[in-house]
């Protein structure tokens, strides 16, 4: 799907990439309090409906992101729509000129490719590995 509505907020970008995402750059991402700050923004800034909250740090080659995911109400190892929002937000704000952006998540590295369009972005693709991290059975 295309992403058309990108809103610049103070120190952040907001967009819907299939679900709502707040993208905010931070320093020292590895020590950042994602749960505490994510929960505060998810409810405080976006109310009951909320938003996923992505904290981003620029790397030498791409970006690193940690995401507080609504519904899960905690940090997750990877969020595809969040990584996509990060790549588009970093392009929109001029932090990268690349249209194939590597994004490091806690669960690995994803690559987001896209084309800039008059009102946003189109032909958006996410690639990355998939690994089984859990298997279980539930008796009904």
What is each residue range found by the language model?
Residues 1-78, 85-140:
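Active-site proximal loop and beta-alpha junction motif in alpha/beta enzyme cores
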